[in-house]
Swiss-Prot record:
This is Ribosomal protein uS12 methylthiotransferase RimO. Pfam families: Radical_SAM, TRAM_2, UPF0004. Belongs to the methylthiotransferase family. RimO subfamily. The gene is rimO. [4Fe-4S] cluster 2 binds at C168, C172, C175. Its main location: cytoplasm. It catalyses: L-aspartate(89)-[ribosomal protein uS12]-hydrogen + (sulfur carrier)-SH + AH2 + 2 S-adenosyl-L-methionine = 3-methylsulfanyl-L-aspartate(89)-[ribosomal protein uS12]-hydrogen + (sulfur carrier)-H + 5'-deoxyadenosine + L-methionine + A + S-adenosyl-L-homocysteine + 2 H(+). It is an enzyme of class 2 (transferase). It comes from Dinoroseobacter shibae (strain DSM 16493 / NCIMB 14021 / DFL 12).
Amino acid sequence: MSQNPPELRPDIAPGIKIDPAARPGQPTIGMVSLGCPKALVDSERILTRLRAEGYAISPDYAGAEAVIVNTCGFLDSAKAESLEAIGEALSENGRVIVTGCLGAEPEYITGHHPSVLAVTGPHQYEQVLDAVHAAVPPSPDPFVDLLPASGVSLTPRHYSYLKISEGCNHKCKFCIIPDMRGRLASRPAHAVVREAEKLVEAGVRELLVISQDTSAYGVDIRHAEDRGHRAHITDLARDLGGLGAWVRLHYVYPYPHVRDLIPLMAEGLVLPYLDIPFQHAHPDTLRRMARPAAAEKTLDRIAEWRAICPEITLRSTFIVGYPGETEAEFQTLLDWMDEAQLDRVGCFQYENVAGARSNALPDHVAPEVKQDRWERFMAKAQAISAAKLAAKVGSRIEVIVDEVDAEAATCRTKADAPEIDGNLFIDAGFEGLAPGDIVTVDVDEASDYDLWGTRV
């Protein structure tokens, strides 16, 4: 899904003033950012570098001298969306530079769109800048000192993604991320903390920690300590928790040491929220995926986490219809869901991905069976969500305001990440609220995925 489709409306960080009508002689660039939050961070870094070099960011195709399309290539459906976005940019603008995960397959892109100016792979920032320089030469800008230390942001001003590493060391058979983005490469802890400090100083109220494998952070650099900060996820979470913003952890692989994070949640240093992709529950399915196969131990860990921090919210994603998945294996997943009682759940129907080892597995599941299992799984997840939210009616909770219009304030609880989880709506007494405000509400009503409340 495009993060700013298709009219190119990046939300600029606090303190930066960019007129869509560039000054005479000022080079202009547009950006379309597709895919996951990790790709969005790449887009922000590219735009920050370009602004520092004097480029203006165009809010539309017509005002841009060239357009960068940051693509997703994880699934065939994502590839199709990326090709469509490239085609639209070529049609509307004509001068297009392609980067991102699909850029790891340049022949695939140029085979469909031979007129693109350049193709670069994921997180190849210097190559993207070189391509921009060739297409739209830079011009010195005496106003670059107006660029805030936090850089250019494509998210609302009050929250920001904080990427702590690139790549992944796992070899899940359905995934090609290691082929596209390489092995785990952790950022130095002091650099992560300094970036977080700048974001908080610029007004960010919520830091969303992301990577491909957040719980493996620092393994590749042997948990090195530098300038008082150690590259280990527990230490990093503690450091970030001291900055005064909400800290939310995403993409946490279910290692045993994840337990060490839970006391930090109970203490209020980081949000009581874990995004852990379990993928399945049947041991045979997990082995075919090349994933950890101890589903019973996972249930024990979940119970332990809840004992330490009863308020913890658990989000996960699953794949149904994986090659070889039998009805009995799928039923095991449904039974596991009954026991696990996860708060937030996403589910995908398996699809082949070019280059994935799972493509060669026997006994692929028929499309109509995958659809049926997906519907049954989501019905189960929806019922669990509805019951859990209904239990919140009558409680008093803190929320962060995301948006305010004439009818309501759209907020999120500590249990809800932006874009992927639900909302809490305040439809009376919300006058004077602004995005980024953190307020207390009494929960009055619940639906399957959302809440309604009254400001205290």
